[in-house]
Amino acid sequence: MKTTTVTPNLIQLTRLGFVNAFLVREDDGFTLVDTTTGGAADKLIEAAKAAGGAIRRIALTHGHGDHVGSLDALEGKLGVEVLMPELDARIHAGEKVVDRKLTGSWPKLETVPGVRLNAGDRVGSLEVIAAPGHSPGHVAFLDARDRTLIAGDTYTTIGSTQVSNHFYWRFPLAAMATFDKAQDLESAQALRALNPAVLVVGHGPAVRDPGAAMDRAIAKAR
């Protein structure tokens, strides 16, 4: 697992070369945002220890398998609070919350989130931002300390910055897993309006001063 210090408050953890999770530094340790694919639990725990802290909570941008893949194993090892977007948590609980077929991978989870996230909620230093489209309940997280935006899969940055509603030939082909492409574009525009200082995403490297790159991505996605 590759470890990249993006800001003093955020460490990007990359598994298999293209799937990211994030350690967000707080006074009591780390918030882990997303868990990558299955089999990563020990590596994620080790990365937090190597960075000088422990994982105190797990917050998820959405419920797809490449973001919740190691959730059950981590919860079993750590017993920490798990926070998942409201609609995606309801989907994982077996509720029918949409009227058409879901896209992306929705693995069966044993973990029941203790908190269902909605726009405006806080997770330590992170503000929850509604960003539906890639999944029905997808959220992003904005760090109030330095305006780092954890955009989940609303954008990808492998090769270049793209909105996930727009088909782009580079793996992981996020458009194929995007539930509502029009809504995803609206969310991408809303995230751009936040004027983040740094953009980090579920797939691809961090982008500093990302405004121009986000603008180009939105223009291509329209």
Protein language model annotation of sequence segments:
Residues 40-42, 46-123, 219:
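Active-site HxH/HxHxD metal-binding segment of metal-dependent hydrolases
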Residues 38, 127-130, 136-212:
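Metallo-beta-lactamase
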